[in-house]
Amino acid sequence: MFLLHTMIRVGDLDKSLQFYCDILGMNLLRKKDYPSGEFTLAFVGYGKESENAVIELTHNWGTDKYDLGNGFGHIALGVEDIYSTCDKIRDKGGKVVREPGPMKHGTTVIAFVEDPDGYKIELIQTSSKKD
């Protein structure tokens, strides 16, 4: 058994693709419209679906906003240089909602960014580099 993907519903697929692909550097792996169901699925990730878990972006036509609730926490991404990554995200128009620094009660360096729908993306420093 292995993880294939996680699905999130998005209100504006173009904005979400711009965020995940242009700002976070993922690739659009595949995209398909389902006219009879009035939805579009787009899969994004950093590598082939056969070798990596990916994110499924589901856009239900005619729905532009979702209640994110309080059950879902975040998606986590490992980065080598969290400080420059946050700078690049900001430069491309992304929203850093928690600046890089040690996590509470620990030493792991983390930051949080937010996608166009308000989903939180945690960035975790994977190397020992700290500014």
Swiss-Prot record:
The keyword Protein transport does not apply. Pathway: Secondary metabolite metabolism; methylglyoxal degradation; (R)-lactate from methylglyoxal: step 1/2. One of its GO terms (biological process) is methylglyoxal catabolic process to D-lactate via S-lactoyl-glutathione. It is an enzyme of class 4 (lyase). Its cofactor is Ni(2+). The active site is at residue 122. GO terms for molecular function: lactoylglutathione lyase activity; metal ion binding. Binds 1 nickel ion per subunit. It catalyses: (R)-S-lactoylglutathione = methylglyoxal + glutathione. Substrate binds at residues 9, 60, 74. The keyword Chloroplast does not apply. This is Probable lactoylglutathione lyase.
